[in-house]
């Protein structure tokens, strides 16, 4: 499995994340993916071939292994990491869409040179507005995926300690046979480590949701106490609702002033326009 591509995609999200989000990404890639790739896959690499039962009945080893280990630990953790990391791509797509809109606005304003467009790509997007909702939803989905996989792991493998010996009486085994698990101590250590890392990620996700909500409430309270001025700088300001509303009001005022000048210069035309408007309103 190629984890480098996933890391490259999520590194772009890391630029626009909170401090807690950056810590979460470090835990994901250093304490989980690196351990999974470097150590855990080698420990579980020979799990099926080294699962030996004290019988020569054909097929008994396979059915006993499937009964006690329906899903490999490594494959379950790999699927968990992929699904947990996927919601962060929503933030990356939202940021890319927002930057595309900024570039489009710059071109319409006559600032479409490569220098300005590159500056839009480099600057950090603030987590506010619709991006705030996208970010919170992605964190909530991460939290749900972590909790669901922890519960699935508990259902599949009660307890965290890897057993050394299991007794199996599933057909086609002739009777109750003893089956031996390879490297039980190593597997127990890595299982505890991965479950602890998953628990840390759950705590980080909860803390990030609380932090985002508190910061959003603080910003709203600050806006009510100190209303923002009409002036602003930066590309992020150009996408704010206040900026858009100011631009619309400016265009409407300019059009209103132009219409008044036309009516003042040619009263006949103004009367005709008024008559047409009355007819339209009557219709």
UniProtKB/Swiss-Prot annotation:
Effect after changing residue 215 to Q: In CMTX1; non-detectable levels of hemichannel activation and non-detectable levels of electrical coupling
Resulting phenotype, residue 235 to C: In CMTX1; the mutation causes abnormal hemichannel opening with excessive permeability of the plasma membrane and decreased cell survival
Disorder association: Charcot-Marie-Tooth disease, X-linked dominant, 1: A form of Charcot-Marie-Tooth disease, a disorder of the peripheral nervous system, characterized by progressive weakness and atrophy, initially of the peroneal muscles and later of the distal muscles of the arms. Dejerine-Sottas syndrome: A severe degenerating neuropathy of the demyelinating Charcot-Marie-Tooth disease category, with onset by age 2 years. Characterized by motor and sensory neuropathy with very slow nerve conduction velocities, increased cerebrospinal fluid protein concentrations, hypertrophic nerve changes, delayed age of walking as well as areflexia. There are both autosomal dominant and autosomal recessive forms of Dejerine-Sottas syndrome.
Consequence the record notes for mutating residue 201 to R: In CMTX1; severe
Protein name per its UniProtKB record: Gap junction beta-1 protein
Self-association state and partner proteins as the record states: A connexon is composed of a hexamer of connexins. Interacts with CNST.
Result when mutating residue 164 to W: In CMTX1; moderate
Biological function: One gap junction consists of a cluster of closely packed pairs of transmembrane channels, the connexons, through which materials of low MW diffuse from one cell to a neighboring cell.
Effect listed in the UniProt record for changing residue 168 to R: In CMTX1; demyelinating form
Result of altering residue 100 to Y: In CMTX1; mild/moderate
Membership in a protein family: Belongs to the connexin family. Beta-type (group I) subfamily.
Short name of any one Pfam family annotated for the protein: Connexin
Location(s), subcellular: Cell membrane; Cell junction, Gap junction
Annotated phenotype, changing residue 64 to F: In CMTX1; moderate
Protein species of origin: Homo sapiens
Cross-referenced InterPro entries: Connexin, Connexin32, Connexin_CCC, Connexin_CS, Connexin_N, Connexin_N_sf
